[in-house]
Protein backbone atom coordinates (compact mmCIF):
# COMPACT_ATOMS: atom_id res chain seq x y z
CA UNK A 1 0.00 0.00 0.00
CA UNK A 2 1.12 3.55 -0.65
CA UNK A 3 1.57 5.98 2.20
CA UNK A 4 -1.63 7.80 1.22
CA UNK A 5 -3.59 4.52 1.10
CA UNK A 6 -2.44 3.70 4.64
CA UNK A 7 -3.32 7.23 5.82
CA UNK A 8 -6.87 6.95 4.43
CA UNK A 9 -7.62 4.02 6.76
CA UNK A 10 -6.71 5.80 10.01
CA UNK A 11 -9.67 7.29 11.87
CA UNK A 12 -9.72 11.11 12.20
CA UNK A 13 -6.65 11.40 9.97
CA UNK A 14 -6.62 14.33 7.54
CA UNK A 15 -5.03 13.71 4.13
CA UNK A 16 -4.19 16.76 1.98
CA UNK A 17 -2.53 17.32 -1.39
CA UNK A 18 -2.27 21.06 -2.24
CA UNK A 19 -2.59 22.32 -5.82
CA UNK A 20 -0.17 25.25 -5.52
CA UNK A 21 1.99 27.21 -3.09
CA UNK A 22 -0.94 29.35 -1.88
CA UNK A 23 -2.88 26.23 -0.94
CA UNK A 24 0.25 24.58 0.50
CA UNK A 25 0.81 27.46 2.91
CA UNK A 26 -2.86 27.42 3.91
CA UNK A 27 -2.79 23.63 4.38
CA UNK A 28 0.25 23.83 6.66
CA UNK A 29 -1.41 26.56 8.76
CA UNK A 30 -4.59 24.46 8.99
CA UNK A 31 -2.57 21.37 9.95
CA UNK A 32 -0.93 23.27 12.81
CA UNK A 33 -4.35 24.23 14.16
CA UNK A 34 -5.95 20.80 13.64
CA UNK A 35 -6.39 18.60 16.72
CA UNK A 36 -5.24 15.27 15.29
CA UNK A 37 -2.89 13.65 12.79
CA UNK A 38 -2.44 15.25 9.36
CA UNK A 39 -0.61 13.98 6.28
CA UNK A 40 0.24 16.51 3.56
CA UNK A 41 1.59 15.31 0.22
CA UNK A 42 3.66 17.81 -1.73
CA UNK A 43 4.56 17.27 -5.38
CA UNK A 44 8.04 17.81 -6.77
CA UNK A 45 7.14 19.92 -9.77
CA UNK A 46 6.67 23.67 -9.78
CA UNK A 47 3.10 24.58 -10.69
CA UNK A 48 1.37 27.84 -11.54
CA UNK A 49 -0.66 29.61 -8.89
CA UNK A 50 -4.31 28.57 -9.11
CA UNK A 51 -5.73 29.91 -5.86
CA UNK A 52 -4.90 33.61 -6.25
CA UNK A 53 -8.48 34.90 -6.18
CA UNK A 54 -9.14 37.49 -3.47
CA UNK A 55 -12.08 35.40 -2.19
CA UNK A 56 -10.01 32.19 -1.85
CA UNK A 57 -10.47 30.63 1.57
CA UNK A 58 -8.93 27.31 2.61
CA UNK A 59 -10.87 24.99 4.87
CA UNK A 60 -10.10 21.38 5.75
CA UNK A 61 -12.71 19.16 4.10
CA UNK A 62 -13.82 21.69 1.48
CA UNK A 63 -13.16 21.60 -2.26
CA UNK A 64 -13.26 24.49 -4.70
CA UNK A 65 -14.90 24.80 -8.11
CA UNK A 66 -12.10 26.42 -10.13
CA UNK A 67 -13.94 26.26 -13.46
CA UNK A 68 -17.67 26.03 -14.14
CA UNK A 69 -18.95 23.50 -16.68
CA UNK A 70 -22.00 21.49 -17.69
CA UNK A 71 -20.86 18.38 -19.63
CA UNK A 72 -18.39 16.56 -17.36
CA UNK A 73 -16.88 17.06 -13.91
CA UNK A 74 -13.12 16.76 -13.49
CA UNK A 75 -12.12 16.27 -9.85
CA UNK A 76 -8.38 16.79 -9.37
CA UNK A 77 -5.87 17.11 -6.57
CA UNK A 78 -2.31 18.41 -6.25
CA UNK A 79 -0.39 19.24 -9.40
CA UNK A 80 -3.13 17.60 -11.47
CA UNK A 81 -5.46 20.56 -10.88
CA UNK A 82 -3.37 22.59 -13.34
CA UNK A 83 -3.50 19.70 -15.84
CA UNK A 84 -7.28 19.49 -15.42
CA UNK A 85 -7.65 23.21 -16.11
CA UNK A 86 -5.48 22.89 -19.23
CA UNK A 87 -7.54 19.93 -20.41
CA UNK A 88 -10.76 21.85 -19.76
CA UNK A 89 -9.56 24.66 -22.04
CA UNK A 90 -8.85 22.15 -24.82
CA UNK A 91 -12.21 20.45 -24.28
CA UNK A 92 -13.98 23.82 -24.51
CA UNK A 93 -12.49 24.29 -27.98
CA UNK A 94 -14.29 21.04 -28.89
CA UNK A 95 -17.57 22.25 -27.40
CA UNK A 96 -17.26 20.23 -24.18
CA UNK A 97 -17.63 22.35 -21.04
CA UNK A 98 -15.81 20.68 -18.15
CA UNK A 99 -16.36 21.70 -14.55
CA UNK A 100 -13.07 21.45 -12.62
CA UNK A 101 -13.08 20.86 -8.88
CA UNK A 102 -9.87 21.24 -6.88
CA UNK A 103 -9.75 18.87 -3.92
CA UNK A 104 -6.95 19.60 -1.49
CA UNK A 105 -8.45 17.57 1.35
CA UNK A 106 -8.84 14.00 0.19
CA UNK A 107 -9.85 12.93 3.69
CA UNK A 108 -12.30 14.19 4.81
CA UNK A 109 -13.66 14.49 1.28
CA UNK A 110 -16.05 17.27 0.30
CA UNK A 111 -18.74 14.92 -0.98
CA UNK A 112 -21.33 17.67 -1.39
CA UNK A 113 -19.35 19.65 -3.97
CA UNK A 114 -18.72 16.48 -6.00
CA UNK A 115 -22.30 15.20 -5.80
CA UNK A 116 -23.77 18.59 -6.72
CA UNK A 117 -21.48 18.82 -9.74
CA UNK A 118 -22.22 15.23 -10.78
CA UNK A 119 -25.96 15.98 -10.66
CA UNK A 120 -25.34 18.78 -13.14
CA UNK A 121 -22.90 17.03 -15.52
CA UNK A 122 -23.77 13.32 -15.23
CA UNK A 123 -20.14 12.15 -15.61
CA UNK A 124 -17.08 12.41 -13.36
CA UNK A 125 -13.36 12.04 -14.09
CA UNK A 126 -10.79 12.01 -11.28
CA UNK A 127 -7.17 13.00 -11.83
CA UNK A 128 -4.38 12.37 -9.34
CA UNK A 129 -0.63 11.87 -9.24
CA UNK A 130 -1.17 8.71 -7.22
CA UNK A 131 -2.43 5.16 -7.58
CA UNK A 132 -6.01 4.92 -8.81
CA UNK A 133 -6.45 2.37 -6.01
CA UNK A 134 -7.12 3.85 -2.59
CA UNK A 135 -6.73 7.54 -3.39
CA UNK A 136 -8.91 10.40 -4.58
CA UNK A 137 -10.57 8.33 -7.32
CA UNK A 138 -11.59 5.61 -4.89
CA UNK A 139 -12.91 8.15 -2.37
CA UNK A 140 -14.97 9.87 -5.09
CA UNK A 141 -16.32 6.51 -6.29
CA UNK A 142 -17.29 5.55 -2.73
CA UNK A 143 -19.17 8.83 -2.25
CA UNK A 144 -20.98 8.65 -5.58
CA UNK A 145 -21.81 4.95 -5.23
CA UNK A 146 -23.49 5.61 -1.88
CA UNK A 147 -25.39 8.76 -2.85
CA UNK A 148 -25.58 9.28 -6.62
CA UNK A 149 -24.44 6.41 -8.87
CA UNK A 150 -22.58 8.15 -11.70
CA UNK A 151 -20.18 6.97 -14.42
CA UNK A 152 -16.60 7.65 -13.25
CA UNK A 153 -13.22 7.42 -14.97
CA UNK A 154 -10.12 7.42 -12.77
CA UNK A 155 -6.92 8.88 -14.23
CA UNK A 156 -3.76 8.19 -12.27
CA UNK A 157 -1.14 5.53 -11.74
CA UNK A 158 -2.47 2.10 -12.61
CA UNK A 159 -1.50 -0.89 -10.46
CA UNK A 160 2.11 -0.90 -11.66
CA UNK A 161 5.51 -0.20 -10.18
CA UNK A 162 6.50 3.44 -10.53
CA UNK A 163 9.56 4.64 -12.37
CA UNK A 164 12.24 7.23 -11.72
CA UNK A 165 12.57 10.34 -13.83
CA UNK A 166 11.88 14.03 -13.93
CA UNK A 167 8.46 15.08 -12.70
CA UNK A 168 7.53 16.46 -16.14
CA UNK A 169 8.54 13.25 -17.94
CA UNK A 170 6.61 11.04 -15.52
CA UNK A 171 3.51 13.23 -15.61
CA UNK A 172 3.52 13.01 -19.42
CA UNK A 173 4.27 9.26 -19.48
CA UNK A 174 1.31 8.45 -17.24
CA UNK A 175 -1.10 10.79 -19.03
CA UNK A 176 -1.40 13.26 -16.16
CA UNK A 177 -0.49 16.34 -18.21
CA UNK A 178 -3.14 18.53 -19.88
CA UNK A 179 -2.88 16.60 -23.17
CA UNK A 180 -3.24 13.22 -21.46
CA UNK A 181 -6.18 14.34 -19.34
CA UNK A 182 -7.81 15.92 -22.41
CA UNK A 183 -7.50 12.68 -24.40
CA UNK A 184 -8.88 10.55 -21.54
CA UNK A 185 -11.82 12.85 -20.86
CA UNK A 186 -12.64 13.22 -24.57
CA UNK A 187 -12.71 9.42 -24.94
CA UNK A 188 -14.88 9.07 -21.81
CA UNK A 189 -17.42 11.74 -22.77
In which residue ranges do the predicted regions lie?
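A generic local secondary-structure boundary/capping motif
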Residues: 4, 15, 27-30, 61-65
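Thiamine diphosphate
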Residues: 43-189
Amino acid sequence: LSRRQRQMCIRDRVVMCPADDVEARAAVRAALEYEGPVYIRFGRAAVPVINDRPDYKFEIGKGTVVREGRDVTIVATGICVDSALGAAEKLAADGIEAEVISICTIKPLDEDIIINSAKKTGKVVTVEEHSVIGGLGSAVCDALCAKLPTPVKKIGMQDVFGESGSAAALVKKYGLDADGVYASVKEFV
